[in-house]
Amino acid sequence: MEDSQSDMSIELPLSQETFSCLWKLLPPDDILPTTATGSPNSMEDLFLPQDVAELLEGPEEALQVSAPAAQEPGTEAPAPVAPASATPWPLSSSVPSQKTYQGNYGFHLGFLQSGTAKSVMCTYSISLNKLFCQLAKTCPVQLWVTSTPPPGTRVRAMAIYKKSQHMTEVVRRCPHHERCSDGDGLAPPQHLIRVEGNPYAEYLDDRQTFRHSVVVPYEPPEVGSDYTTIHYKYMCNSSCMGGMNRRPILTIITLEDSSGNLLGRDSFEVRVCACPGRDRRTEEENFRKKEEHCPELPPGSAKRALPTSTSSSPQQKKKPLDGEYFTLKIRGRERFEMFRELNEALELKDARAAEESGDSRAHSSYPKTKKGQSTSRHKKPMIKKVGPDSD
């Protein structure tokens, strides 16, 4: 009996009668409406009710609203270094001018006096107007003004190539130094010039020329000082392949107001090398030799002075020295007698040479006659033999 009841409990849910009973128990609102053909009326009937859909979409909307609120300026995580922003200050031309302009404020640059020792890391040559420095070493540059500029004045530093065939190119670091992790998080890796010790430095790229520059606010000199000092660093060697590639560069320092108007300009040449003292000494010696070989002449006489100097040098070499006398100090009597005899022999030789030259000039009109006489003297006479049969 118990086995039959257990079999019925298993078979009832699987029978068709049980399913029809359960189907009739469902409320009519939960059954999908059908058309006369028995197919669903539309796809919209398959969607969830509106209250259920709003309940499910609620958490997503809350997340979308709360996500922007979490990104506040104070709690924002530090992002990686982004490319430098384009400067809103327009430049006057595609190639910046390098001519010195002091303006109304007497703006000009100055440098510390340093020697040419091998251990020096930064040295400036006045005669060459050139700064020699090592890679990534501090180079103090002095800003001098005769009167205080207006508030909001800025100081811009920009590097350009010195030679005309390279001026249109942008000065940038080589690919090797760009990949080096030597940045402070503020300067872009492709910028050559950096400012040290100034948190207000801005590294900018021009929209039109794509040139790199660094701008810092102008600070008046401190009490007891006559100038303001800015510490620059050059982050690539002058000999790096793919960068400057041994091409000389100029650093242009400009004084600008808050609107970008020029107030003053000054420039100097830069060489980034391993031994600044040695390179400065070598270039100054070459420059000095060049000046001695080609001295400066007043304007208007340069065209005539060049042939005169070249033609006068051979004349000085061909100038006879027979009429000049020299005094020679000799130690010892024996040496003196030897040199005296040598001098007398040379004097006698010169006298005989002069006499012979005089005789040759006097008898130059009779060379053939003398020659004929000399040959006839030594000529053997011919004798005709007379035989017995001759008359």
Swiss-Prot record:
Sequence intervals crossing the membrane: none
Ranges annotated as biased composition (Basic residues): 368-383
Annotated stretches, region: Interaction with DNA: 271-278
Region (Basic (repression of DNA-binding)): 366-385
Residue numbers spanned by region Interaction with HIPK2: 317-358
Binding site for Zn(2+): 174, 177, 236, 240
UniProt biased composition (Basic and acidic residues): 281-295, 350-362
Gene3D superfamilies referenced in this protein's UniProt entry, alphabetically: 2.60.40.720, 6.10.50.20, p53-like tetramerisation domain
Sequence segments annotated as region (Required for interaction with ZNF385A): 98-298
Chain positions found as Phosphoserine: 9, 15, 20, 39, 181, 267, 313, 390
Presence of the UniProt keyword Metal-binding in the record: yes
Primary location: cytoplasm
Region (Transcription activation (acidic)) residue spans: 1-47
UniProt region (Interaction with USP7), positions on chain: 357-361
S-S bridge residues: none
Cofactor detail note: Binds 1 zinc ion per subunit.
Modified residues (N6-lactoyllysine): 118, 137
Chain residue ranges for the region called Required for interaction with FBXO42: 111-234
Motif Bipartite nuclear localization signal boundaries: 303-319
Name of the protein in its database record: Cellular tumor antigen p53
Record organism: Rattus norvegicus
Gene giving rise to this polypeptide: Tp53
